[in-house]
Amino acid sequence: MRIVVKIGTSTLAHPGGRLNIRHTEALVKVWSDIKNAGHELIIVSSGATGLGVGKLQISRPKDMVTKQAAAAVGQCELMYTYDKLFAEYSHTVAQLLVTWEDFDHPHRLNNLQNTLERLIQLGAVPVINENDPISTEEYSLGDNDRLGALIAKYNHADLLVLLSDIDGLYTADPHTHPEATLIHRVESVTPEIEQLGGGSNSGLGTGGMSAKLTAAKIATGAGVDMVIANGANANVLYDIVDGKDVGTRFVGKNNKSVSYTHLTLPTIYSV
């Protein structure tokens, strides 16, 4: 099974922006085990700006230039951490930084698809993030929930998992409505479901429930199941892969026919 896992800033970092080392180690251990079990894994990782803020010891910037500078610093720490932790389990990571233009232009999209396919063939774990240091408002993807959905759509994933600081989609905001109940299964993202979306609760991230519902529409429209789950427990991914009733599962429509122009790759390695 090909799995795209999107990890949010609030799951990777402490509130001040510093890396949550213990939890990140636990996540990478589970991801490595999932890969050892024979699954193909693509990581879409937020955290660059948040980690950069922590590394630079500044407050969350409001201006774009400082945000981009923080992202440039944080991306180095993010990939250093992933490279070090995955290497402990004999896995190799690869970094891909993308912008909206990479999905908007067919040739660039094709290059992205082919690079990801080759990395997976070679046994690497692609780690993808938006290229925040050079992204402009016009060409920004906005949040990594959407990015994860686009990666899942255009690279024929079977499952997209959004790991965040929430358990899933509720009938109302559980922070203000204690009686709210978790919705375990969504067959279709209807206008009624979309009305349940809200803003981002984390001071470090950008994607709230509304962004996750947008991602669900993209993924399920391409035939990809999507699950929103709380990443506080690293082992939750085992239950999701096993099909257990955890978080909120958005059921993919029965079609895998997405716009996908795939160039024939030369077979240069036997993997």
Q: Where do the language-model regions lie?
A:
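Nucleotide/pyrophosphate-binding catalytic subdomain
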Residues: 1-221, 225, 231-232
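Anionic-ligand-binding alpha/beta catalytic cores of soluble enzymes and soluble regulatory domains
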Residues: 213, 217-260
